């Protein structure tokens, strides 16, 4: 059905211009005897009545806000360079007797209107409006010519009067559309006054596709304590949207104030708050929100007015060592949860910044630092001496192990020395292939001396 409607609309728009004329846009009619003029022109007013004919003296009086009078010979009054303020009735009299009245209307032709149509939500009528660049004259009128197109009832033409709002400085017209209607409209705005008329180009719209909400309202951006890269954003649905029947989806965009590129987030349906997790620390951000019907019906609203906000900034504090520490610059939560996602961020990552010179360091601080240094030096000296003593002991033990065996007879008591290679005693009998091993470390039970090697020293 929608395809048929689109085909019909395209056919109408492709037709000759005559077929798209929705109505006749003409200048407004004026009362008989009214003289019309453009600003800056010269106007001649003629006093009516036979009494004013000939070379008689006629007295003219302007009935407007200004008290002006003229006296002429004959029944004509010439006004040069007339302006809008000259509009009004001019009374002519002869010998203090009123002869007649001549109305003068000075007006500016209307400018060509530029029509725009919208529908705030699926439950209301469509509104077509035009905002002129200058205030129109009081006599300017506007009317909307419309053609309704659907597949069931064909075409129907109608007109809608438009009202001018001094507060909004615009002409507006309402086109009745019932809820659920799926029809096309072709509209054109005619603006006319007593000196001319202009009509807009034809505009076509679909009753559902033209739905466009107002921007979200009451946008608030606030910092979250303890979160140096978070911003909380909240808003409300526009007053012209009833969320009881139709819900809205939202888009949120934000950027640092010095950047021109926005980051855009598409939010779930009916979500009216959001937390930005990747804001730059200590930087003011610009935030905007817009809405659209939950099922993508119609168009996105305009972006809401810009609102700025800065993430939480901790108060710097001075440590006992005289160093200024700003908790905002380093956060356990920030590094654990979010820093891995934004390693390419260009913000500064400095953590500590000295704020006091060494000359201003307090005495307790100096004593603590000096004591720590002295303790460290003493510990190093102790470790070096300990290692040196250990190395010396190991060297002595190694030299004793590699020295030649002591003589068999010594003055003092001997301690047995176990050698890795046993001493060989000369063989007395047996074949050459037999080797007799002496038993190392075996002593005589009655002698305190080791005489197991006597065969080697005293051969038989």
Swiss-Prot record:
Ranges for domain Ig-like C2-type: 20-116
Keywords: Cell membrane, Disulfide bond, Glycoprotein, Immunoglobulin domain, Membrane, Receptor, Repeat, Secreted, Signal, Transmembrane, Transmembrane helix
Single GO MF annotation: ciliary neurotrophic factor binding
Record domain Fibronectin type-III: where: 109-214, 215-313
Keyword Magnesium assigned: no
Tree of life domain: Eukaryota
Position of the signal peptide: 1-19
GO-annotated biological processes: cell surface receptor signaling pathway via STAT; endocrine pancreas development; interleukin-6-mediated signaling pathway; positive regulation of chemokine production; positive regulation of glomerular mesangial cell proliferation; positive regulation of interleukin-6 production; positive regulation of smooth muscle cell proliferation; T-helper 17 cell lineage commitment
Disulfide links within the chain: 25-190, 47-92, 117-128, 162-173
UniProt comment concerning the protein's domains: The two fibronectin type-III-like domains contained in the C-terminal part form together a cytokine-binding domain.
Protein function: Part of the receptor for interleukin 6. Binds to IL6 with low affinity, but does not transduce a signal. Signal activation necessitate an association with IL6ST. Activation leads to the regulation of the immune response, acute-phase reactions and hematopoiesis. The interaction with membrane-bound IL6R and IL6ST stimulates 'classic signaling', the restricted expression of the IL6R limits classic IL6 signaling to only a few tissues such as the liver and some cells of the immune system. Whereas the binding of IL6 and soluble IL6R to IL6ST stimulates 'trans-signaling'.
Protein name: Interleukin-6 receptor subunit alpha
Species per Swiss-Prot/TrEMBL record: Mus musculus (Mouse)
